[in-house]
Structures are given as C-alpha cells and as structure tokens.
C-alpha cells in the first residue's frame, strides 16, 4: 500500500515534470536560438585624427613625431614588438601597428625615420628599403555619442591572434572542441566541490555556458538558472558552430570598465589596456587579458597589479602545460613586468572642443540613431601634435598674462589654409573640460580684426586706392539718423593726420579706417562678409568698420582663410570621411574651392599684413619666434580691453586666438600684449616650411619715398619697395629720385 | 576699367547660416560618369608639345599618390582618385598638375563649378603656358558650357589660345 503510493507519487511527479518541463525546455531551446541569431552588438562610433603621412622632405620636428606616435597608442620600447618605438639620435625606429584605412587594410610595419633640423631626411623599412610615403595609423580621438553602457571593437574569429583563440580554451574550457555545451566532468567536479563546501563556490562552466550566462541570463547563482544555462548551452551547440560560439564569446566577455562604459571583448580590451589592436598583442599581454576573464576587477592590472601579475603568470603556466609555449619562452615572459598603458585615459583626453564640432556636424547630416552604437568610423582633419601645441600654448599663455589666476578664458584654432582643414581647436583653457565651447559659441566683438576687409574693399579699386594713398586720420563726426553723433577715437587718443593707407592698417588707426570705410561703403563690407560665409546681422552701424560685430573664433578663421589661401575660399571642415562598420563609405566631405576674384587686391593686402608684423601693431611677433617664416597678421582689441584677438597666417597655418573674460567685463587684455604672445606660443612648436611669397603677375613693384606717394630711387633714404596693381603707381617723383637709376624692381625692402 | 565694387564670385556657395563650419554635406553622386569630358581636356593638349613646357619638380610621395589616383581613375573609381589627390594636395597644395587633375576628376563627376575652380587655381599657381595651361582653360571652358555660361566659355576658349608660347631660341 505504502509502496504503491510511493510509486504513484513518483510517477505523478515524473509526469508532472515531463508535462511542465518539456515545454519549458522547448521554449528555452527556441529562445536561445532566436536570441543568439538576432543578437545585435552595439559598438561605439569612433572618431579618428587625420593619419600622419610621412615622406622625405616633410617638415616635422622629432618631438612632434613622438607626440603623434604616442597618440596612436605607441610607446617607447623595443621596436621588435608591435606598437613600440625607440629613438637613437636623429633616428626613430618604430613598429607601427596594423590599421584599417577606409581604402586599405595596412599591416603592421617596421620603419626607420631620420629627422634632421626639423625635416624628414630618410624613410626606410627596417630592411633598409627606402620608401616614398608611409601613412601611419590614425589616432583615436574618442567616441561619438557613446552608446550607453557597453563598448566593444567587434573582431572576426580569424582576426584574433591564434594564441588567444587556443589560449582561452586552455584556461577556461579545455574540452570546448569536444563537448556539446556542457562538460559533465567539469560539472561533476564543480558539484562535488560545492557539496563538500556546502555552498555554490565553483562553476564548471564551459565557454558556451559562460556565453549563455553573459548574453541571456542574470548573474545570480541559483539552481534553476544553472539548469536554464545548461539547456540553452546545449541548444546553442545544436544550432550554431563552435566557431560562431567562440567568436561571440571573444567579443562578449566582460573585461573591465572604461569610465561608465563596460569593456566587452578582447578587441576593445586590447585597445584600452595596451593601446594596440588585438592582432598586435604579445604573448604576455594575451595572457594578462585571458587571466582577467575570471574577474576583470579582481585581476585589474592597474588597480590590482600584484594579483594581475600572479594571474598572468598562472595563465602563462597553463600555456606551458598545454604546449602553447616552451619553457624558455615561459621563463622569459614571466620576467616581464605588466605593461599596460596607464596614461590611456580616453575619457579625460583633450580634444573635447574638436569632438563637439565633429558631433555637431554629423548630427546635422545624420540621424542620431544612425550614429549611436553603429560602429561608424569618422575620419577627421585634426593633427594631434598641432592640437597639443594649441592646448599648451593657450593654457600657458593665459596663465602668464592674466591679472589674477583663472581670470581669463580663451580659444584657439589652427587651420590649413589651402584646404580649409581644421587642424586644432581649443574652446577652453582646460582643454579636457566639456562645456562652453568658446571656439564655436563665444560671440565676441572682433575689434580691429575686421579692418583688413575694409582695406581689401578699397584696394580692389586701384584707380582710387593703392597702399601709399594718403588718407586722413583725424577727428571725424558721423551723423546717424535718429542717433547721437558718432565720434570714433584712436586707441592712443591721438589723430595722426595724413597717413599712407598701408600705415593706417598696419598701425590700426581707427579714424583713418572709418574715413576709408565710409568711402567704400558699409553695405559693401556687409556684402563682402556675407560672400565670405559670415552673416553679421542686418543692422548696419558704421562702428562695424571698427569691429563692433560679434563673431565666434571659428567665424573669424573662416573670414581669414581666403586671405591665407591666395584668394581661394574653402569652407572650413573637420571631417573628411565617414565609413560604416564594414568599411563602406557612407559620407564624404570633399575639399571645395571658390575663387575670390580679386587677386591683385588680395596680394596688396597680404603685403600690408606682412608690414603689420614687421613694422605695425604686431611688430613684437618676430622677436617671439625662433624663426619668422613670413607671418602675416592682425591684432584686435575691443573697448575697455574686453577682448583680445590675434589672427596670423602663413601659407601653411592660419591661427586665430581670442582671449577675454566669460562675463565680458574689462579684462585688461590687448591684441598685441595678450593674444599675440599666446599665438606665438602656439605657433613656435609647429613645423613649417619658409616659403618665398609668390606674387601674382598683375603686380608691379616700385621704390617709393615712404610714406610719400612719390616714386623714389633704391638709394633714397626712405625707399621702400611697394607692390602696385599694374598702372596704379604714383606718377610724382621724389626729390631724391635720380633719373639714371631705374625705379622699378622686382622685390625687396629697404627702410 | 571702372571698378567701383569688388567683383566677388557670385557663382559661389551661399554658405549656410550656420557658419560655424560651413562644410558641404555629402557630395551627391555625379549625374553621369562623363569620362569623355576629361579626355577632351587632356588629349588635345597632349598633341601640342611644341610650345614651351614647364614641369615642376615632384616630390616622390606626390608622384606615388598621383599615379595611384590616375590608376583609380582609369579603374573607374573616381571617389578613390579624388581622395588620393586630396592626400597629394596636402603635401603640395600649390602643385598645378595635381590641381588640374582634381579639376578633371570633378569634371568627370559632373561637379562643374568645382572643376572650374580647381582649374582656375591650377592656372593661378601654374606656368600659365604649355600643356597644363591648355588643360586649365579647356576645363574651364567645358565647365562653363555645362553651366550654360556660354559667353564666359567663349572667353575661356580665347584664353586657351594664349597658352601656346614659342620656346625661347637657344644659342
């Protein structure tokens, strides 16, 4: 009777579990298959600097190359290892990691670069073969709209180093190739241990089980969850190949945190901890990461280096036991110190202002959901070494020149004029700070920075104006309908009387500029600014002639770009190309040109802005540079010294510096005493080639008895060689003019 | 000539009100791959090698890139050709040959205004005589014709004639 009851109970329970369990198992099986097949991994969209192109003849300082190498994740060390470089005198031996360019998969390569006197002298492969051109990998600047809590760099199974693929099995799951999702022997061992200890302390999880747990299940340790895990693991193995499972595992496994983001997979972990693509990892680095699978935080190489080292050596021991490495290798490797890139704090990295510019532009052209977590790669125009120079120059320059600590703020922009590519952008004296981006958003009075455009308008009328035309710098009353009389004054409160046009610009005389500006007309100035891509507003007040117009530093850079590019306007751009996760191009921002058809007038203005540096308001500049490669420039100071500007350019670099106070209070700054030295500080570490000015054929040069509008001889005391648009030179002769000598010459200056 | 106002190019872009970075959005694909257009520019000039020719010195890196650009162009990959030429122009921004090649790529892509502007830039920095000068003005003329600015196109054809300069007599 009792026995029958027992049998009936057992049968009943069996039937119940069969009835309830089978549908459960069926459902789990279906779920596991569906969810694995449909899984979509997010991968942050990443932003890259412009790749540095190396070639013989490139102007590049050794220190700048080192900065560039460090920004692509390379470190000083033995260049037989990928990602390392060493320096011997003028030569740098480097082992550049592989990089996937939009148009080319480039493998790792060993190179020798010789730099002498700031110029790349030779570029060779390590076997001595000379190379014409090498494109270094592009530095990663940061993520675009981080996709939330996870980040990974998806990597195909075949792209992982073979040692990583076999090593992970040796350590985590030796039976992986043979089991069907669960490993009964491993499970039995775990169960036995757990029973003996009276608690769940050991998991005999296979790689498949770990994957199932990470992908589908909560991390609690209950028996039900363990059962679900086993069923789903067997299910995965039924429906998918070992390769697919392993690939998913290697991309999913949790390997620590990067700020608020979890690092998933060996691809991203390799970039995070070593600054290298996973293919470039050495054996000890692979062992360290494999060791972290057991507990990414417990074995964290930076926070818990001793534990991490022990764990790495344990993993190396497993490699030795399974024959993956030999004893000699093992002994050599365990002698190595941990080798993580602790400086690699991506979230705190600078470039915040530039990244914001990139993000704004992308948001304008794409929808947020197309950008977020889709693994796009955005290639930009930023030069890491120029960016560093701009950040440092601004921070140091402000600290040296402010009345009290942290009073001033500033912005700096560097542009390559001929292409309009933005090489550096700083929007805060603390470059890593996110927030108010002054380079893009601070609309400030530009002051005298506007004046060259007034003079350009005048010089475009060669029958009326030349560089030596006399204009009057004197008290001037401007009547405005319904408003008080406007009486502009000079900075020094002195009227200088009749002055040559070029001197009025070079010395930034206000009254002369207003007189000239009223002649050429205010509407013409607004039209010109509009044609150069700037909308200064519709209300036209003559004080605009003195720069009572509020513009952002980026707008000022756009205004000056065609002056620095021989009259070809190119829209400033920060992005060159956008590719998707499969390297297909989805966006391109090509170089565009638009001619400003006043070649002659632009060249005259260029000459006058050079004169501003040699003998005008910017005359301090040459003394602040080791070598003056022919900088043209203009200072700007606004009322009560609220804003200080300096814009300077060569054919290679256009730089804009603004400083002032955020609350727009008087800041005690001037263009020549504050902004100019900061500009020099930024410019000094940049590489540049001195380029002889190339003047358009439409110009003719004459000796002028400066500042009189009279032709002179070369040996006259005040003789200055001045360019004129053909036929516009003065006809009057100076007293010292000697008919025997020719007054015309090609180029030169004497004063 | 009475010039009371700056004659700035009106053909240019009306740059966005968002002037922070007046970048151009993604390039629309060329309406047609007008390969023959570029050929019209190059071939006639190549036949006339009699006049004075000026060949600028070339950086080997630029040579490598411009040859790759030519190969990409011949393979029909105009996007890649343009990218390679941009890389070369970063190295030598004032190279008239590179600028003219870019103008021809833009011509093939049907970007008439950019073709004209790159050719004009090439002429400005170039020798202003010989083959490249002829290619400059031929490109400008073709682009203007496509833009239906026929008078200006005729003007460009006249300038084309001035490219032919007899070489200096050698002793």
Set out the residue ranges of the language-model regions.
Chain B
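TPR alpha-solenoid repeat register
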Residues: 98, 132, 136, 169-170
